[in-house]
Amino acid sequence: MKNEVITIDLGSNSFRVLKYDFLNFKIIDEYHQVVGLADGLINSGLISFEALNRVIDAINIAKDKLSFKPENAVCVTTAAMRKAKNSQEALDFIEKNSGAKFEIIDANEEARLTLLAIKYALKREKIDTQNFILLDIGGGSTELIVNFEDNFYIKSFDFGIVTMTQKSSKDGKLFEDLENQKIEIKKFLSTLDFSIKDFPFIATAGTPTTIASIKLGFSYFNYDKNIVNGTILDIKDLEDSLKLLKQKTIKELIEMVGKGRIEYLEIGTYIYRLFFDALEKDNSIVFDDGLREGVAINYALSKK
């Protein structure tokens, strides 16, 4: 079909693909896989050969499932590639072996596109608000966006579920790091000249959607984003997911959250909880929509 676009978001842990009808602003199909792009990055400063091969395998699976040519896809990549010393060689390797040409986008563009996706998601879910806070917990960075009427304010924090997990396993300073980051979040919030007290707190990315999925009783294999979208989580839901991580066997956890997410869910939950505390919020609305949807909507708007 002439009115289709494929968008790919290669994150620090996840690889997400969307087939999108850009004339009617509708999702046709999608694919998601954990590729662990940032594995080992904090120690070596490099994207590993093993990670690159996982990305190429994921592209090949996705192109067969969604029937597309990788060279025609709109492909973006984020924090892991921004940080890696060998990012250009890594991107050249991916293009040479798959045809997919990735663009490294900066944190502000990543936040703008994710915000675009959430604005459309709010309309779709009939949630009428111009003022909200958006949290995007990534693998290598975490973005906080405050949307106030026609303006938005972005702060990108240099930590994510993968990098903080790797760092804490190396130095054991997780809670110290979280406290330091809380100070940084508060500093950013103090620059705003309006109150966010009544702003809904919206969260996207794998950690919030996984906790929502656990709350709703889904397994990894019957996850339904249409039901997850709009789910409201509170601090007790976060605490329940942390308890489950300690109580369940590895086999049970793989069925619940998927193989590539188990090792990061604990730290991801602590990061999520950090923002509840720093923002002084009691609950959070979860959306599955994120960067890949934002890239697709941005493309659709450019074709209008």
Region locations from a protein language model:
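Short glycine-aspartate micro-motif
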Residues: V5-D9, F132-D136, F201
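A structural signal for short, well-ordered beta-strand segments
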Residues: Y31-V35
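Post-signal peptide N-terminal segment of secreted/secretory-pathway proteins
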Residues: N72-A73
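Helical "lid/coupling" subdomains associated with nucleotide-phosphate turnover
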Residues: K19-F22, G36, G40-K65, A80-L91, ...
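Ser/Thr-glycine-rich phosphate-binding loops at phosphate-binding pockets of nucleotides
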Residues: S12-S14, I118, G138-L144, G206
